[in-house]
Structure formats: structure tokens, C-alpha cells
């Protein structure tokens, strides 16, 4: 999370926007405190609802650069329906989905992206569910911009952020 935070903080000035015209909306989970560390407007929303709240904000305030910060549990479990609809509507908002394949904030429950057989506190005999593939889900929802990167490659991460910011629609 901190590597992504540092990359986003370093990249934001490139947008050339006043900080009061940038908003970060988060849900619940490991990534949810993200807006507190940005020198912009932000909202820490309820579990799974960040895409819905951000959609409302982006459609009512087209002058804002709206970013969603969410995790695999928040976006692909309780918030899955909101994520899918945000992607298919192609509203001008940017979604950063942190996929650590575990509910880290609650000390290790398996998540929708955990591998089969993953032993956690909630699956002591190993998880039975096949994992979601977030990229396939986004493509299936007909998202107009889909990218994947890794936090340890700052150069690539920043390039993906740049391309997402330039994309007119959901990225």
C-alpha cells in the first residue's frame, strides 16, 4: 500500500490540477486509509460502496478528477456489484484496486482472489473457491481501460497511472 501511495503522491502534480479538484474515495480494508494521506479532498466510505459514491460524485461534478481506492475484498466481495456497474457505465473515474489476495485488515480471512487451498483463519482446511480474476472481470464488464501493474515497479506503476488519468472514462 505504501509503495502505491508514494507513486500516486509523486504522480499527482503531473496532472496540473489544483488539489481541491482531486478527490479520493475509499471503502473498507487495507487501502481504505489512503485518502487521509493525500493532500486532496477524500472520503472514507462504507464497505464496498466506494465505486457507487464516486460514480455519483463524478457524474455530478465533472470538473473533478475522481479516484477510487479499494482492495480485493472490498471491491470483489461486498462491493462487486458496484464495481461492475461503475466499469460498464464508463463514468470518468479512476479505480485503483489493491489485490493482496487476503483480508489483511481483519487478520487473514481469505478473499475473492485467494488461491484454492489457501489456509486462513476463516478457511483452516483451505479455501474451496476458485479465485476471481479482476482483469477478466473488468474486461467482461466492458471496461474501456484495464491495466495491471505491480507496486515494486515504480516506473511501470507511474506509467499506468498516467495512462489511466489521461483516459476519458473509467480506468
What is each residue range found by the language model?
Residues 22-29, 33, 103-106, 131, ...:
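Core alpha/beta catalytic barrel or barrel-like domain that forms the active/cofactor pocket
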Residues 1-4, 10-17, 59-62, 88-91, ...:
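Generic secondary-structure signature for well-ordered alpha-helical cores
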Residues 30-104, 156-159:
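Thiamine diphosphate
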Residues 80-85, 105-118, 137:
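Active-site-proximal loop->helix
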Amino acid at each position: 500500500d505504501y509503495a502505491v501511495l508514494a507513486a500516486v503522491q509523486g504522480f499527482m502534480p503531473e496532472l496540473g490540477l489544483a488539489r481541491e479538484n482531486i478527490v479520493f474515495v475509499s471503502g473498507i480494508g487495507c487501502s481504505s486509509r489512503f485518502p487521509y494521506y493525500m493532500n486532496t479532498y477524500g472520503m472514507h466510505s462504507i464497505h464496498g460502496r466506494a465505486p457507487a459514491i464516486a460514480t455519483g460524485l463524478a457524474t455530478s461534478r465533472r470538473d473533478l478528477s475522481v479516484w477510487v481506492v479499494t482492495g480485493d475484498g472490498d471491491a470483489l466481495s461486498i462491493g462487486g456489484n458496484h464495481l461492475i456497474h461503475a466499469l460498464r457505465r464508463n463514468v470518468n473515474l479512476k479505480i485503483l484496486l489493491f489485490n493482496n489476495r487476503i483480508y489483511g485488515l481483519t487478520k487473514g480471512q481469505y478473499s475473492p482472489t485467494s488461491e484454492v487451498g489457501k489456509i486462513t483463519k476463516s478457511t483452516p482446511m483451505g479455501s474451496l473457491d476458485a479465485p476471481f480474476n479482476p482483469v477478466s472481470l473488468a474486461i467482461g464488464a466492458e471496461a474501456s481501460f484495464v491495466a495491471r501493474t505491480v507496486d515494486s515497479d515504480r516506473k511501470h506503476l507511474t506509467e499506468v497511472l498516467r495512462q489511466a488519468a489521461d483516459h476519458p472514462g473509467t480506468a
